[in-house]
Amino acid sequence: MSIIQVQNMTFAYDGSYDAIFENVSFTLDTDWKTGFIGRNGRGKTTFLKLLMGWERPISGTIAASVHFDYFPFPVEDGGQPAMEAARSMIAPFTAWERRMDELLAEGSEQALAVYGELQQRYMEADGYIIDELITREAAKLNIPEEALQRPFGTLSPGERTRLTLAALFLKKNNFLLIDEPTNHLDMEGRRLAGQYLAGKKGFILVSHDRDFLDRVVDHVISVNRADIEVQQGNYSTWKLNRDRQDQFELARNESLKRDIARLTASAERAGQWSDRVEASKIGGHTYDRGYVGHKAAKMMQRSKSIERRQLEAAEEK
C-alpha cells in the first residue's frame, strides 16, 4: 500500500483568471478503486493530466510512489497484431527480445553481462509468460484468442477498449488513470468492463455513467466549486450523503430565516416603543436596536452562505 498526497495545490491554465484548483489538499490510497466525479469543466481530466506530469501545478505538490498510466492509451500502428499491440502497452518486450538475441550472438563477456541485466528486467515484467497472461485477461473480457492475432485496427472500438484495459492492468507497479472508458462500449461491453474493474484495485475512474461507477468504485472524489471531497463508498453512497447534507442545510436555513424574522419584528417593536418614549420626553430604559439589528444581519449573512452552497450543490447534480 502507498498513497497519493496532494498538498496545497493550485492550478490555472495560462491566460485564465480563474483557478481550476485552489489550495486543495487530500490523500488517496493506491489500493482504492476511486471514482472521480464533478460537473464538466471542474477539472477532472486536468487533474489526471497533473498526475501524469503533462501539466504542472502553479503551487503546491503532488507526491506518489507509483507509476501512472493513462487510458485511453494511443496505439500508433493499427496494422500490428492485437497481441503485439497489447505487449507494447505493457513493456518493450519485442525490442528486449531482439536485443537479447543480438547480445547472445555476440557472446563477449561484456555482451553477456548486459544480457543478464536485460534478462532480469524482462523476467520482472513477466516477459516469459506475457502472452499467456494477455490471453487469460483478454478472455475475461470476452476477447477470444483468435482475435489477438488479427490487426489491432480491425477490432471493434469496444474490443480495443477492453483489450487496452487488460494490457494496462498487467503492468507492474502501475496506477491506472481511466478517463471515460464507456464511450465506445455497448451494454454488454459495459457489463464486462465493470465486472473486470470491480475485481481490480488501484485506479482512478472518470465516468459520467453513474451505474458503471456504482458497480466499480469503493471511494469517490467529488470536485466541487470550492473544494475537493474524498468519501468512502460508491456513487450511490456519495449521493445519499450529499442529499442528506443538502436537506440538513435546507432545514437549518429555514430555521435561520424564522429567527431573522423574529429578531427583525422585535427590533421594529422596540424602535416604535423607543420613539414614543423620546417623543413624550419620559426617561427610562432604552432598547438597543443596534444590537438586535446587528444580530439579524449576521444571521442573514449565514443564510445567504447556506443558499450559495445549496445552489452550488444543485449545479453539481
Question: Residue locations for each model-derived region?
Answer:
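ABC ATP-binding cassette signature C-motif
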Residues: 1-254
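Flexible nucleotide-interacting loop at or near the entrance of a catalytic core
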Residues: 2, 106-107, 113-129, 144, ...
